[in-house]
């Protein structure tokens, strides 16, 4: 009984334990579920908070982006408005220029009409004079109609020539009295020419080799070295039968100089292959850039011109490698600067401005092979870009007479340029062409009636004409000089100007017995 009871109690205790355990585990499970639900709710709340924060951040970023786009659009609109305003200003300026040109043309037309009217009046006067003389000659006995006509024509011709000579003298006298610039220009052309070296113009450079075996190394396997060299430098490398020498050919002297330096470095180094060629060409390019800058600075020091923009100095230095008719353009610019400075000093005008304008007058020749356009226009654009004074810009654009000079210094630069180019030996000219030009000059002078002899002197800068005093009178000398000058202008090509000097000499001799 005791055992059975114990067993029953044990079973009941086990069942009770199971029931208690079940309810305990159920309670734990419910707690975990509630905890999980709370955690889930918290996650959802945190997620909502993060989403709200992200939303606000995105809104702020969107507003910033919209503000930035609006600012960019405003700037772009302002820039376009400025450009439109500039274009309107340019159009207005062009319109004003056209109006000024129209006014000038109208003035010239009026002047031409006035001159035509004067010519018509002169013609009427001549015709009236002819009629009067014919009436007089009809009364003269013993003269045929042809003889009377010849007498009248000869008298009219003589009177007309005298009237023309008087008019020309009056105009020249009036011009000399009223124009101070014209007087200064005449004075400036009388100053002695400045001497400088002549430089031969060439499109090739010769590089000496230590031996002919070096030619094969320069060519390289299947010509790869020479192809790489020509591609990197833009220069033709000519290898022929000339012993221990090769030739570099190019119209651009800067590229040719870079190629010469690079090739000489390669020959000294001995290692010639495409990679080494590229290194040496780059070094040579830097060397030439340094030389260009040094030459520009030396030119400024030599002419005492300071305050130029570094880029202008570099462009100026490039002129060291440019030649024109055998004349080094940088030396020519220095020469023009010095001559213009001397003229300005003699005339009491701005020496610094004249020297600065003279030094920069051919600036465009340094870049005319890189940018299309005449060298005068390129030089003016460069000077404007680097903020050169207005008078210096006028010196550049007026030195070939393309525009009117606005200051006396521009006229001096123009004169100095002509003097530098025209002085004997400045620019290379073959002896045959030089002699032919002088012969043509004398032939033109001798083609007129009444010429006793003529001589081309001052290297063709002056023609001296001796006339027969019994054929050419003093009033006819003025007409003769003008006619010779006009014929020279129409038939000859020459730099600068040619002076026509007509000389009439009377000699009287007698003998004492």
UniProtKB/Swiss-Prot annotation:
GO terms for biological process: mRNA catabolic process. SMART domains: HDc, KH. GO terms for cellular component: plasma membrane. It is an enzyme of class 3 (hydrolase). Pfam families: HD, KH_1, RNase_Y_N. Residues 203-288 form the KH domain. It comes from the Bacteria. It is a single-pass membrane protein. It is found in: Cell membrane. Its main location: membrane. The chain crosses the membrane at residues 4-24. Keywords: Cell membrane, Endonuclease, Hydrolase, Membrane, Nuclease, RNA-binding, Transmembrane, Transmembrane helix. GO terms for molecular function: RNA binding; RNA endonuclease activity. Residues 329-422 form the HD domain. Residues 78-106 are annotated as: Disordered. Its EC number is 3.1.-.-. NCBIfam families: HDIG, RNase_Y. Endoribonuclease that initiates mRNA decay. Belongs to the RNase Y family. This is Ribonuclease Y. The lineage of its organism: Bacteria, Bacillati, Bacillota, Tissierellia, Tissierellales.
């Amino acid at each position: 009984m005791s055992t059975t009871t114990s067993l029953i109690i044990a079973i009941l205790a086990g069942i009770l334990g199971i029931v208690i355990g079940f309810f305990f585990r159920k309670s734990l499970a419910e707690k975990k579920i509630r905890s999980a639900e709370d955690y889930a709710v918290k996650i959802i709340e945190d997620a909502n908070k993060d989403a709200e924060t992200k939303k606000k951040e995105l809104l702020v970023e969107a507003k910033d982006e919209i503000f930035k786009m609006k600012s960019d659009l405003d700037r772009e609109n302002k820039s376009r408005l400025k450009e439109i305003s500039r274009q309107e200003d340019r159009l207005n300026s062009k319109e004003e220029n056209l109006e000024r040109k129209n006014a000038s043309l109208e003035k010239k037309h009026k002047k031409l009409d006035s001159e035509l009217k004067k010519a018509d009046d002169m013609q009427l006067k001549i015709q009236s004079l002819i009629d009067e003389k014919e009436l007089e000659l009809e009364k003269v006995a013993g003269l045929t109609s042809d003889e009377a006509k010849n007498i009248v024509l000869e008298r009219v011709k003589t009177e007309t020539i005298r009237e023309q000579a008087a008019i020309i003298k009056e105009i020249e006298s009036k011009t000399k009295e009223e124009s101070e610039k014209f007087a200064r220009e005449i004075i400036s052309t009388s100053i002695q020419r400045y001497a400088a070296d002549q430089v031969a113009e060439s499109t090739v450079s010769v590089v000496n080799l230590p031996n002919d075996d070096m030619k094969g190394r320069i060519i390289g396997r299947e010509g790869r070295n020479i192809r790489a060299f020509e591609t990197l430098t833009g220069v033709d490398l000519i290898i022929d039968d000339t012993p221990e020498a090769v030739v570099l050919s190019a119209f651009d002297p800067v590229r040719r100089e870079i190629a010469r330096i690079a090739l000489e470095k390669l020959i000294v180094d001995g290692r010639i292959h495409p990679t080494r060629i590229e290194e040496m060409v780059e070094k040579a390019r830097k060397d030439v850039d340094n030389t260009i800058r040094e030459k520009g600075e030396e030119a400024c020091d030599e002419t005492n011109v300071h305050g130029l923009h570094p880029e202008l100095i570099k462009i100026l230095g490039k002129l060291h490698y440019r030649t024109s008719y055998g004349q080094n353009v940088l030396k020519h610019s220095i020469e023009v600067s010095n001559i213009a400075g001397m003229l300005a000093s003699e005339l009491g005008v701005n020496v610094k401005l004249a020297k600065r304008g003279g030094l920069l007058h051919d600036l465009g020749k340094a870049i005319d092979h890189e940018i299309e356009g005449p060298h005068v226009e390129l030089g003016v654009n460069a000077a404007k870009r680097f903020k050169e004074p207005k008078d210096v810009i006028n010196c550049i654009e007026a030195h070939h007479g393309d525009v009117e000079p606005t200051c006396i210094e521009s006229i001096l630069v123009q004169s100095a340029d002509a003097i530098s180019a025209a002085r004997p030996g400045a620019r290379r000219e073959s002896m045959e062409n030089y002699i032919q030009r002088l012969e043509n000059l004398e032939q033109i002078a001798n083609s007129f009636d009444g010429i006793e002899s003529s001589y081309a002197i001052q290297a063709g800068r002056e023609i001296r004409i001796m006339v027969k005093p019994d054929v050419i009178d003093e009033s006819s000398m003025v007409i003769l000089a003008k006619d010779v000058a006009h014929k020279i202008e129409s038939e000859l090509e020459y730099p600068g100007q040619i002076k026509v000097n007509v000389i009439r000499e009377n000699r009287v001799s007698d003998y004492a017995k």
